[in-house]
Amino acid sequence: MTNNNNRCVVTGLGLINAIGNNVNECWNNALNSVTGIKNTTTVDTKDCYATLAAEVNYKDLDSIPNTANLDRVTKLCIKATLEALDDAKLSSFGGSTRVSVIMGSCVGGAVSIDHYYRNDKPASDVCKMPISAIASSVAEYVKAGGVVTNIANACAAGTISIAYACDLIRAGKADIVIAGGADAFASVPYSGFLALHALDSNPCSPFNKCSGITLGEGSGAVIVESYEHALKRNAKVYCEVLGSGVSSDAHHITAPREDGEGQMNAINWAIKTSGVAKNEIGYINAHGTGTAKNDNAEFLSLHTIFDNENDNLSVSSTKAMVGHCLGAAGAIEAVFAIKALTTNKVPATLGYDNDDLVRLAEKAGKIDFIPNKSKDKELNTVMSNSFAFGGNNASIIFSKEAGDVKTTNDNGKVYVTGFGIVTPFGNGVDTYINNINNNVKPESNSIHSSVVADEYAKYGQKPTYRKHDNLSQLQVLSGMQALENANITVTDENATTIGIVEGTADGAMGTCLQFTENIVEKGCANGSAFKFPNTVYNAAGGYLSICTGIKGYNVTVTNGSQSGLQSVAYATNIIRQGKEKVVLATGTDENIEAINEVYGKLNVISNDVALPFEGKNGFTLSDGSITIVLENDKDANARGAKKYAEVLGYGMATSAVPFGTVKGSDKGLDEAIKLALADANLTIDDIDTISGFACGLKTIDDIELNSYKRIFGDSLNNKNLIEVKDHVGEARAAAASLSLAHAALMLSGDIKSDNGYKLSNGNVTKTVIESKNLKNVLCVAYAAGGTYTAIVITK
């Protein structure tokens, strides 16, 4: 049986979608087989072959207090969150670092992106656009002060968010996590799926007609709580959250593997980590999109795993009622699965006529796909599955029993064993070290990285170069470099033991902006089938998986610039908990024309070159991709890997302020540093060097300096300060990752010295930092909205 410290329980539910504005309304309509699919009137449908959508009908959405400046997707998320908190008898958390927010999304603020191009590009739309804004705004609304991030793995995002919530609780990093997902119906996904000919002109018919999807919108929120915390406050408990599985197909950016390998890996890992038998699972809320490739692969996966193992399995897809809600789908379907479990009723899959039922009987075997009408069924354990663009797969299990989850947090030390470095001043570790030796610095206020086909050709990937967007090119090259630098070859034998955690501030927003500008000009019927797959934030991580053959954990996190360091914290947790042996943790952002434009609207790009501590009103906008290879000590030792540094501990905290600002969020950095030191079992006196995030913008630089003064006091006079943005500008998530990569290269002696800073009596002075004097380095990163990550590494 699961130990109490590993038990995660659900204590609150929130839901809004096309068949209801709260959990009870949605559930009652689901049991009555009500569909919310109708003709849409909210997007341009001229010359479009499909005009259906499952849209939310909640007239008071724009009346939720203090949400006037938020995108529709964030309003949907806050609506579901508030219901879940009320259900759990919880409210505002006073900034507690024990309360976290993890939200999934696919297209983020796509409604605001559309509005931007249709209304003369107002600056007020910019901070509503990124996926980053969602969880950050929820955290501000409920005053959560713990780990705050968004999972951007397209249609698997909502499921992975709940899985990560449990990982944080089992790691001792949180007592309560508000987890879920949200997406709004908008012209970008509508036009994109039209371009792929993936929409059905009729209501979608999962596991049946399989002629396309119908898009939906909404949000699902789940309050995940440690069992002991819930017990202490005498909370109502819906169910236990047992194990989960997250995998990558390494196959195709939009289509699943026909053999279902990746799906089956995720499902089997969820079962194994739950400690349940296959025949204990009574109901599965399937991904079931209504496309032939997806449904056929899922059919195969379910039959392969459960035939001859479970003769009492029921499966349904609720997408026939609520549509495909993209990043919200996994969260919405998790709520449906939990309601099925707790009410002993299973919702139907709609759309079968008599002839369809004959065909279903031929291919369903002993699996009951619950056609057309819901049914009563005694349930003890249920599963929810989500599969996504990029080849991402996620499965999670809920139960009335505690299961046998055996997560540990002590699977050995975690080492840095390799790097891939792509910056505006060249690509590769050796190039970067040479640039540091020559003290290379930015020479303009906006700079960008580039990748050429020959760099792909070195790794046998030249044919794929032109298929990848700019962001993906940066990520794929740095990822392939990192594997080479770490001397790791991906094989069929080790592919599932290697994972990817991509961190990004803005992700694919640049491509999304380009895609939207085109359809605003030419109409939704003329979206680009070539560009659309690259509008999802996890495309870069998906392409990296495809090019390298990595089939393990694959997740994209996004919450501002600190995402590049947050990815290292997430990856460290994955290795500590024994989910993978090796994880590529990345920080990647691009500076294409569209991105430069929207940052210009915010007036944060300096008029000239801006370097740390120059007290300017802007920064040098930059980009790049940094991949850091993390590995457990046992496997690193076994293969004789070079160890650049050891990850001792990490901390993540939030002092939430309106997204797009940092002013007033100082406490968040203080708390992140304290948590990192505690996790590393070190004191302030053990830290000799800090690798910071100063960029030249005075507001940001002052937060960093003032926090150091509060945390370190007089001992600050003895500490060195590395600022990588001296060399690469404000590269956002790439700079956050680089802060750790640079420090690790100094700890290993690969970088002998660097021009850095000293803080003496409150004043910043320049100095030369010798690597031979370094032992313990504190790396820190910030995000607009007030989230901070701190990580301690050592020799």
Feature-to-residue mapping (PLM):
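Flexible, low-complexity linker/loop segments at domain and module junctions
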Residues: 1-10, 93-96, 276-280, 306-311, ...
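Active-site pocket-shaping loop/turn-to-helix segments
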Residues: 18, 63-82, 119, 123-130, ...
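Condensing-enzyme catalytic core mediating Claisen C-C bond formation in acyl metabolism
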Residues: 7-11, 31-40, 203-274, 283, ...
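ACP-dependent fatty acid/polyketide chain-elongation machinery
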Residues: 1-66, 228-240, 335-350, 394-464, ...
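Active-site-proximal alpha-helical scaffold in enzymes
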Residues: 77-87, 142, 146-181, 214-235, ...
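Glycine-/small-residue-rich "gating" segment that lines the acyl/pantetheine channel
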Residues: 31, 39, 121-124, 160-163, ...
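Conserved beta-ketoacyl condensing-enzyme motif
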Residues: 9-10, 34-150, 185-190, 278-294, ...
